[in-house]
Amino acid sequence: MFRTENKKYGVSLLLAFMMIMFALTGCGSGSGEALDISKVTYVKSPGNQQNIEMYVISSDCTVKHYDIKQTSDKKIVIRDLFEGKLPSSEEYTVDSSKVSPEGWQQLENKLNETEFIYLSGDVSYTDQLMDEGSFFVEIQTGMIKHLAGGYNAGRGKDKDNKKFRSVTDILDNILADAG
């Protein structure tokens, strides 16, 4: 009888220890390893979708800014931009600049902190009265690409919208300081 009680006590103690460890460290959510991000593409399209801004930021801190002005009757599909399908050259201009290395590091840290790679592809928020447009962010590493965003993305109060908004806030800040 004494041995059975000791075994029960030992098993109970082991289970309690395991539950405490899972509570403190999590149960395998996320890889824990920081992603080595090589490129971030950020697209902003206001509600009227006449002008679209696309920023391609590389790990060497270079920025290509595409200012797309839709002039033809052919509607621009935003997701096509991420596949390199730009409209005719008359419909956009391109300029180059650089973000600071600190700005790039801040962006990379935020993308890892928010576990952006695990965000849903559709972060749309349709309950808002104001039409702020569509926002998309694609991150690329040596092996993977992940695109998230949508209509009024980042404007909701749920967890994914808050994470998305924290990334676009950093993007807006570092792009405003780009030179």
Residue ranges and their predicted role:
Residues 2-14:
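Bacterial N-terminal signal peptides that target proteins for export
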